[in-house]
Structure formats: structure tokens, C-alpha cells
């Protein structure tokens, strides 16, 4: 056993002081029957620096009856509580539960407070380090509950404790509740899934096509087979949203009378417009180009994002009452001062439309194009001639888009030259998505990684090719851009009829200057805040701008978007099905032009099937306390050093703990009200061997019977969920009914309604029903 500091506290105050001093790195020893063994086995998530012994604190081992009921000190030994005449006389349920705990020796040592605060008994969590190293389950900082795909015969029958932060959601810039909307789809509630998704992202039909899916690499499903195809599901929900635009883009119920101008109609501008209009403001969106949509319409090729989708998205937003003013160049045809005088707030979401120059000799020659301008021209219907041989300089998505457009429009020999390497694990990897690079190579485009353009070759005033040198590294260890080259020789020479530069972009200086001169409430969103970013990053930025606008226009008013608390338990899935393959046109069809969408999308059946693959990540360990189940049935209250809560609220399990106790919080007392007159109390427990083993299933019941009819009931299930679970369905089936075989059977069936058996624990349903039936009948 490792060394640790040991402190013997003489008072509750001293114990709390010590716990605070160790800042969560100390553990409390309240009985000594579990903690030291766990430390010896090194099974805890982290080894404590100190153990605070509170067994010697005087005055907390009482069992007292008063006019309100029973009061038990937190350090009362279990054996003493069970032997108490007051407990045996009126609280037989508690006495029965205690008698099933462990052995007489342990009951003579263990305390009531210690039993309530004990750690879970999941064997993955408790696996001794000495046997073969720790099992890094969810409670120990792992990504997934080991029981989900492993042996789960003793685990939860009613779902998992949801994570406070899901890996997929936390890596989404908009923090989208991905498990939330997946769960709705599993239950056949596509409308509910759409409502959840729209809280975070109002353009899912767009992001479902062009999002770089920061979420999918973090999906825990990849530990089992393949990550959930989140983008496929999002696109399916997005299509449903656009098909039902009148529902999801409805005008607000109340108007605030405030007016907001949005400069720019790209993803940030559209998202900001949606949320501000939803809040009740009048919104006008200004777009410099002839048609709204910003980068979505004028930069992304139609084979990735069809123009019809963008137009339908704009029409849906216009249906909310959002006004779009296209062909208006803010700063020229209308000034920021004009907008400031007419609107209560302005959101500047102008984007980054100025292409960065390469800064090498030959950049002024004819036949040299900048990617954004080139893409804007082809998206407007032009087909600029490039010649047979094209070199695209850059390693991001824009470069790949430009290269694929050139190849599809007739250029036979297309090359992409970039500083970045192809190693996906390197800090210097290409910024384009792997899928984009794969598709480009399928279409005959050659990628030349780790090369930097030294000069552009010129013949008769027209580009004729490039000379390139080896790029040794692109970024410093801290991530800053600082390419290093091997300049002693030319690494490659490529001939070209056209060269397209796609090395990045920045905000137009005119836009920046116009915004700087603006007065009033002006907020920034999208690329003007972060520089070039993805569509979902622009949406996330818009949400921040909207909150700032709301704060400025309505000081003191709560945020318009309130994320509702998640469910108590979530359904843990292990649907043994492979990831749906992405639907994609064959290469020969893709090469016919740029107008047909590469990915036709998935059917609703495929979307639903993919959603069912979501693990709904959570912890499946069950609450181990026999006494806790009894106290919930008795409607007890737990008094701590910080608060007084009902027993049901005390066992508020989370993925990394089982109770509400803070690191510096201790139980002082347990208060149990007088049982109702005529209450029949029962504790039933099923174990594999001796009654003192940990429960496979337990049932604590308190049934109030008068003249053979149930007047009230509290039935609590133990060892079937991450915390003691009220069987409210069973209680409802009993109230007002005669206590007989029929009612007991109905109550037993109701008790397991909503259960979510895992691969190996369906047997718990039968045991639960049998114990509930016996408890109702008083057997």
C-alpha cells in the first residue's frame, strides 16, 4: 500500500477543515470496512494523499426517537441501529435491510453514514491493479463504460447515468447535444430530434453536408467497431427540418420592437439571423453579392453543397420574417453609420473574402488565379478556361475544391502542391478532410505534400509552371505557422497552363475599416472573429454574438436559449450493426461536371439505423447500498454539513460519483418520519449465495393498507439502476385497489416498465417482478 497521511478528526468541523485543505485529494474513513481494502488493491481512480478518520468523533452515534420520527447519527453502527428497540418496533424495513448487509463482524464496524456514502461495487471499477493493471472505465477517466460491451450481468437494468460532458458534444464547436437528438430518433421521434438540433444549429441541412465532423473521431463507438455516422444522421434531420420549414422556422410569437442588422449572409449571418428573429427582433440581412448565402452559395462547389439547398435554407429563414437585402455593399452603397442610425444593433459577419498572396516571383503573370475568386466565378455559372495542366497551391478544403472543379471541367492534368504532409497524426498534416483528399485522388488529381512554391515560372507573360522546394516543417511545437525549407536545390518542377493560389484568406480591409468606424452596438461573428473557419465554427460564433446582442438589448433578461436538463438515466445501446456506408456517386458520374451532388444522402431507415448505433454513453454501475433503498422507501432525509435533502435526491448518481456529497461535505444525521398508520413494511433481497451478499435485486416497500385496500405505497428498487429507483408505475397500479393476486401481478409488471435490459441481465426483470409481487402481498 502506498504511503498516505492519516488524520484523526476530533470534530465535524475539524474533519471538514482537513477535507478542504486537501482540495479533493483526501478520503474519509467512517467505518473502515471498505476504503483501506480499495486502497490496498489500488482500485480507486486516484490514490488519496490523506485519510481522515472520523470514527472517533463523539456524539454522532445516537438513535433517537422524537415527536417527528427517528433521528440517527451518521456514525451509528449498523448493528446498533438494527438492534434498537425503536427501529425494530416502528421501522422494521430499516432493520431488515441492515441485517442483509455483509456479515455480523462488518455490521459491528460499519456506520450508517459510511454505508450510504460507499463507492460502487462494479467489478470493472474495483478490478485490482496488481492482477493486470487497472481497467480504465468511465469512472476512472476512460472514454466508455466497460460493462456496455463486456460482462454486464450485474449492471443496471434501467439505463446508464449520463455523462456531464459527452465526447462528441464537447468536440463540436456548437456543443450540439448529439446523444440527445440521437435518442429521440431511436424512439421514433424525428420531430423531437429536430427541435433539439435546432437549439444548437439552425442550418443542419447545410452542416449535414459540409461539416468537418469534429465529433466523429471522438465517438466511443469506434472502440467497439466504427464511429456513428453523425453527419449522415444530421443531414437526415436537416432534410426533415427543411421539408417542415413552416414548423421549425415559424415567426416568433412575440415581437420585441427591436431591430438588428446583420452584415453578411454566410453561415454566421444566417445562424445569427435565426436566433435573433426567434427572440422576437426584426432582422435584416445585407449581402454584397447578387444572391444571399455568402460562402455557402458563392464558394462551396455545388457537388458538395447544392445551390438548391442553400436557396431553400434562405427561403425558410425568410419565412420567419427575416428580410434579405442582396446586392448591397455595406460601406459603399450604405454605410455602417446609416445602419447604426436605423437599427438597435449590428452583427458584422462579413466573412474573409480576400485571398492571401503567395509572395513569390511570377505572381503577377496571366493565368494565375486566386481560389475564392475562381470558385465564386464558377458558382455564378462562369466556366473560366484553365487549360490542360493546372497546379493548385494549398492543402486545405478550398484548395481541394478548386482542384476538383478544374478536373471536372476538363483540365486533364491537375496537381495540388502543399506545405503540409499526409501523415494524419502529424501537427503538419493537410487541413483538408481525408474524405476530400480521397475523392480528389479518385478523380485523378495528384497530391504533392511537403513542397513549397519557390517561384512561378512565366513564359511570354503567362504562367508556365512552378518550381518547388522541400518543406521540412510547417508549424512550431506551439502550433504557430513558421514553415522551414530546404533551399539548396529545387525539389520539383511542374508545368502548368494555370496556377490557382489557395493558401488562405483574410477579411477585406474595407470591411474591417467600415466596422471600426461604426458606432452603437456592433458585434462580430464568424470569420471576422476567428479568421477562416468551418461552417459549424461560424454557427458557434454566431451564438456568442447573439448572446451579446441579447445582453445589450435586454440587460438582465435570461438567455433565449436555455439547455434543458437531460434525463435521469439514458438508454445504453449496443446494437450490433456496422456503420452505414456513405452513399456516393461513382467516379465516372462525378466527372461529368460540378452540378450533381456527390453524396445523394441516406434514407430515413438508414438514418434511424445509424442513430441506434449511438451508445448514449454513460455509467451502468448500480447503487450498492441496501440501507439507501430502505431510506428512500421510508421517505428519509439526509442532513449533511451543507444541506438537508431527501434520500432520493441524495443518491443523485453521476458518471463519476454516486451521491451529491461534495469533496468537503459529510453526513451528520439521518431523519426518518413516522410511518403512516397501517403501513406494511417489507425488505426483499435476492443474492446469488448468502443473503449478506451484495444484491442482484432488492425491493423496499411501504404499503399503507386499510380494510384490505391500498391507500398509498412507496416501492423502491435496488441494484437495478445507478441509484435507488422509485417504481412509480407499480405504486400507481396499487393505489385504491384491493391487495390481491391480480393487483400484485399488475404492480410487478408495472415495476419493470421502461426497463432497458443489457445483453446479459434480462433475468433481472423476472427477479424484480417476483420480489415486487411478494412485497405487495406481504410475503
Q: Whereabouts are the PLM-identified features?
A:
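C-terminal structural segment of proteins
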Residues: 1-173, 624-779
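Surface-exposed acidic, glycine/proline-enriched linker/cap segments
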Residues: 138-162, 246, 372-393, 471, ...
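Mid-to-C-terminal Rossmann-like scaffold of FAD/NAD(P)H-dependent oxidoreductases
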Residues: 438-446, 452-462, 544, 551-616
Amino acid at each position: 500500500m502506498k504511503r498516505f497521511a492519516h488524520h484523526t478528526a476530533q470534530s465535524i468541523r475539524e474533519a471538514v477543515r482537513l477535507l478542504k485543505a486537501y482540495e479533493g485529494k483526501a478520503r474519509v474513513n467512517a467505518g473502515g470496512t471498505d476504503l483501506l481494502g480499495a486502497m490496498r488493491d489500488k482500485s480507486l481512480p486516484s490514490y488519496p494523499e490523506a485519510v481522515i478518520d472520523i470514527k472517533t468523533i463523539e456524539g454522532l452515534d445516537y438513535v433517537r426517537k422524537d415527536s417527528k420520527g427517528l433521528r440517527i447519527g451518521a456514525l451509528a453502527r449498523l448493528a446498533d441501529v438494527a438492534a434498537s428497540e425503536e427501529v425494530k418496533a416502528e421501522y422494521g424495513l430499516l432493520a431488515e435491510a441492515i441485517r442483509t448487509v455483509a456479515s455480523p463482524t462488518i455490521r459491528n464496524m460499519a456506520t450508517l453514514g459510511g454505508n450510504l456514502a460507499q463507492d460502487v461495487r462494479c467489478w470493472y471499477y474495483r478490478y485490482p491493479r496488481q492482477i493486470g493493471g487497472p481497467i480504465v472505465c468511465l469512472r476512472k477517466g476512460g472514454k466508455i463504460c466497460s460493462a456496455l460491451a463486456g460482462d454486464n450481468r450485474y449492471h443496471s437494468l434501467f439505463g446508464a447515468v449520463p455523462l456531464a460532458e459527452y465526447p462528441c458534444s464537447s468536440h463540436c464547436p456548437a456543443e450540439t447535444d448529439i446523444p440527445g437528438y440521437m435518442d429521440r430518433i431511436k424512439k421514433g421521434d424525428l420531430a423531437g430530434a429536430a427541435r433539439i438540433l435546432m437549439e444548437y444549429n439552425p442550418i443542419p441541412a447545410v452542416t449535414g453536408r459540409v461539416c468537418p465532423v469534429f465529433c466523429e473521431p471522438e465517438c466511443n463507438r469506434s472502440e467497439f467497431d466504427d464511429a456513428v455516422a453523425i453527419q449522415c444522421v444530421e443531414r437526415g434531420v436537416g432534410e426533415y427540418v427543411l421539408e417542415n420549414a413552416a414548423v421549425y422556422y415559424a415567426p416568433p410569437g412575440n415581437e420585441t420592437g427591436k431591430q438588428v442588422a446583420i452584415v453578411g449572409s454566410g453561415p454566421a449571418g444566417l445562424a445569427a439571423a435565426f436566433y435573433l428573429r426567434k427572440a422576437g427582433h426584426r432582422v435584416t440581412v445585407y449581402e454584397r453579392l447578387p444572391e444571399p448565402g455568402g460562402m455557402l452559395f458563392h464558394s462551396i462547389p455545388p457537388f458538395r453543397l447544392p445551390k438548391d439547398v442553400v436557396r431553400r435554407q434562405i427561403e425558410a429563414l425568410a419565412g420567419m420574417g427575416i428580410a434579405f437585402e442582396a446586392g448591397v455593399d455595406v460601406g459603399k452603397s450604405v454605410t455602417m453609420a446609416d445602419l447604426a442610425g436605423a437599427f438597435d444593433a449590428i452583427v458584422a459577419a462579413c466573412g474573409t473574402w480576400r485571398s492571401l498572396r503567395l509572395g513569390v516571383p511570377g505572381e503577377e503573370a496571366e493565368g494565375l488565379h486566386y481560389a475564392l475568386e475562381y470558385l465564386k466565378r464558377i458558382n455564378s455559372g462562369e466556366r473560366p478556361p484553365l487549360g490542360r495542366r493546372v497546379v493548385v497551391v494549398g492543402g486545405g478544403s478550398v484548395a481541394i475544391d478548386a482542384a476538383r472543379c478544374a478536373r471536372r471541367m476538363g483540365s486533364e492534368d491537375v496537381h495540388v502542391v502543399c506545405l503540409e504532409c499526409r501523415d494524419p497524426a502529424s501537427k503538419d498534416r493537410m487541413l483538408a478532410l481525408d474524405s476530400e483528399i480521397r475523392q480528389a485522388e479518385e478523380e485523378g488529381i495528384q497530391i504533392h505534400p511537403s513542397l513549397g512554391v519557390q517561384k512561378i515560372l512565366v513564359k511570354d507573360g503567362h504562367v508556365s509552371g512552378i518550381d518547388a522546394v522541400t518543406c521540412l516543417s510547417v508549424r512550431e511545437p506551439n502550433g504557430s505557422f513558421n514553415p522551414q525549407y530546404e533551399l539548396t536545390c529545387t525539389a520539383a518542377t511542374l508545368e502548368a497552363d494555370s496556377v490557382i493560389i489557395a493558401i488562405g484568406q483574410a477579411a477585406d480591409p474595407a470591411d474591417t475599416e467600415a466596422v471600426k468606424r461604426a458606432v452603437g452596438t456592433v458585434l462580430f461573428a464568424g470569420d471576422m472573429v476567428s479568421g477562416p473557419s468551418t461552417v459549424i465554427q461560424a454557427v458557434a460564433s454566431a451564438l456568442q454574438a447573439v448572446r451579446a446582442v441579447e445582453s445589450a438589448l435586454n440587460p438582465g433578461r435570461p438567455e433565449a436559449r436555455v439547455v434543458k436538463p437531460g434525463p435521469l438515466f439514458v438508454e445504453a445501446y449496443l446494437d450490433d450493426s456496422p456503420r452505414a456506408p456513405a452513399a456516393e456517386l461513382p467516379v465516372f458520374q462525378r466527372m461529368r461536371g460540378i452540378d450533381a451532388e456527390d453524396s445523394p444522402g441516406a434514407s430515413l431507415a438508414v438514418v434511424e439505423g445509424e442513430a441506434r448505433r449511438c451508445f448514449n454513453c454513460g455509467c451502468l454501475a448500480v447503487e450498492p447500498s441496501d440501507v439507501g433503498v430502505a431510506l428512500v422507501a421510508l421517505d428519509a432525509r439526509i442532513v449533511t454539513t451543507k444541506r438537508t435533502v431527501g434520500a432520493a435526491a441524495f443518491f443523485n448518481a453521476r458518471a463519476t460519483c454516486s451521491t451529491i456529497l461534495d469533496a468537503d461535505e459529510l453526513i451528520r444525521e439521518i431523519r426518518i418520519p413516522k410511518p403512516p398508520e397501517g403501513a406494511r413494511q417489507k425488505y426483499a433481497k435476492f443474492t446469488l449465495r448468502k443473503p449478506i451478499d451484495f444484491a442482484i435485486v432488492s425491493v423496499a416497500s411501504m404499503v399503507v393498507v386499510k380494510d384490505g385496500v391500498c391507500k398509498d405505497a412507496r416501492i423502491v428498487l435496488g441494484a437495478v439502476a445507478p441509484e435507488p429507483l422509485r417504481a412509480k408505475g407499480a405504486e400507481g397500479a396499487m393505489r385504491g385497489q384491493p391487495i390481491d393476486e391480480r393487483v400484485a401481478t399488475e404492480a410487478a409488471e408495472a415495476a419493470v416498465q421502461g426497463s432497458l435490459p443489457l445483453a446479459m441481465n434480462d433475468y433481472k426483470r423476472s427477479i424484480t417482478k417476483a420480489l415486487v409481487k411478494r412485497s405487495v402481498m406481504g410475503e
